[in-house]
Amino acid sequence: MSEYICLRDMAKKNSSTPMMEQYLRIKKDYQDALLFFRLCDFYEMFYEDAKIASPVMEIALTSRQKIPMCGVPYHAADLYLGKLLRRGFKVAICEQVEDAKLARGVVKRDVIKVLTPGTAIELELEGANESNYIASLFLKDKGWGLALIDLASGQMRAAQSDSQDKRVLPDELFKVSPREIVFPEEEEKHVIEILSSHNRISILKSPLEDWAFDYSQAKNILEGHFKVKSLAGFDLADKDMAVSAAGALLYYLKKLRKDSLSLIDKVSYAQSGTEMILDAATIKNLELVKNL
């Protein structure tokens, strides 16, 4: 079957075409994201994704063979992606990964990256002068660990507190107005309570596998990324909770973006309660906090 026949036309013939089967296989691995499926000169969306995205992107919802669908031109994709990300959606970008002219049957496709409000440095969501922070939160009975990354600048910071007073946590977390927060799946209810109590429920909440916050796992990820044998040079040698938060955040970003994140070349540690995660001069100079 020729790759030049667009899926809209194929869907007229049969909703179980090889290309639709390919779409469904890929979508199965990205149930928590809207899938932008590249076909010819468009990104297509189908089924519930189309129903959800079409009103947000302000485009028409159509259907073929009872399959809801909508599409946007690939050259204008940033405009529509921006609308979705500003509303807190996660979007998986699926591209052709082989030359259509050389393909036998359906062209191979794969998700090349997943965009979220905290990771979409390719897009200017709310202006070029604002940093785009993503946070990672690790809660324990004995305290908490926090990590922050701005992918635009490569700045990465981590902190932890042994205080069991969770009221201290939101102040540290909201100093930089993160667009997204990553946390262990088992802590989802607690994190939602924290965000709700401070009117920050609109922040994209991204639960992550609990094992990603395991200290040994997180430590290995950080040492591998920074190419060091010890985290002592970053003052993280005995900061288990900060390491867990930071390592899990790097793991999450590498999984979504599928790149080396080479811009992130160090992590700075700040002791909560005695030293601000971001000092006042840094906040002012880098404009890390929105004017309310």
What residue ranges belong to the model's regions?
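Charged catalytic and DNA/RNA-contacting regions of genome-maintenance
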Residues: S2-L292
